[in-house]
């Protein structure tokens, strides 16, 4: 790997990516952002960017999440952190405190009694903050939609950025939602609320 010297011209080697073992393709092969970045890196050997783009790039690679597991969807959320899926390879690491987290994953049935606690935890998170609503119960009440004590979707309490459908959604679905959130952050930059 290293530089190649051809007639006193320094040429950077072709940029190589990480191959996804499931698809045998480069990770990000279908993503225009990664294609453009790899082309620029292999062409020039360095990247030129703005400070805003650099901060946005750093945010997508270091999302610290906080679990708000309320029911059975939390089991799938825990499975997503296990070695089989290893969501930390995408820079998605758990934190115990809302003051240290960027993302809140609401997984499960949100009751009227729990709604003020959800809002309080959301308000304690620093800006920019993002919310992933995981599962039918968090998205719209689920099986308990018509119950007097259930909030019909956590988006009535906090603004939601990504909805992950399913009852319960699989760990792959949550991982896909995380990747969509990273793409949304890259596309929009900092979200001002």
From Swiss-Prot:
Cofactor: [4Fe-4S] cluster
Catalytic activity reported: a quinone + NADH + 5 H(+)(in) = a quinol + NAD(+) + 4 H(+)(out)
GO molecular function (one): NADH dehydrogenase (ubiquinone) activity
Membrane topology qualifier: Peripheral membrane protein
Domain of life: Bacteria
Cofactor note: Binds 1 [4Fe-4S] cluster.
EC number of the protein: 7.1.1.-
NCBIfam families cross-referenced by the UniProt entry: nuoB_fam, PRK06411.1
Subunit record text: NDH-1 is composed of 14 different subunits. Subunits NuoB, C, D, E, F, and G constitute the peripheral sector of the complex.
Protein name: NADH-quinone oxidoreductase subunit B
Native source organism of the sequence: Bartonella bacilliformis (strain ATCC 35685 / KC583 / Herrer 020/F12,63)
Lineage of the organism: Bacteria, Pseudomonadati, Pseudomonadota, Alphaproteobacteria, Hyphomicrobiales
Gene name per UniProt: nuoB
């Amino acid at each position: 790997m290293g530089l190649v010297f051809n007639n006193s011209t320094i040429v950077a080697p072709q940029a190589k990516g990480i191959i996804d073992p499931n698809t045998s393709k480069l990770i990000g092969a279908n993503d225009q952002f990664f294609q453009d970045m790899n082309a620029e890196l292999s062409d020039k050997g360095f990247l030129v960017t703005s400070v805003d783009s650099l901060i946005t790039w750093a945010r997508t690679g270091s999302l610290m999440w906080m679990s708000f597991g309320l029911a059975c969807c939390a089991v799938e959320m825990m499975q997503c952190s296990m070695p089989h899926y290893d969501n930390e390879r995408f820079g998605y690491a758990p934190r115990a405190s809302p003051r240290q987290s960027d993302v809140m994953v609401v997984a499960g049935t949100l009751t009227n009694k729990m709604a003020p606690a959800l809002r309080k935890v959301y308000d304690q998170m620093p800006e920019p903050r993002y919310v992933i609503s995981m599962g039918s119960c968090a998205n719209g009440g689920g099986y308990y939609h018509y119950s007097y004590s259930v909030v019909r979707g956590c988006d009535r309490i906090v603004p939601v950025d990504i909805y992950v459908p399913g009852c319960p959604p699989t760990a792959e679905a949550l991982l896909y939602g995380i990747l969509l959130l990273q793409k949304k952050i890259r596309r929009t930059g900092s979200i001002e609320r």
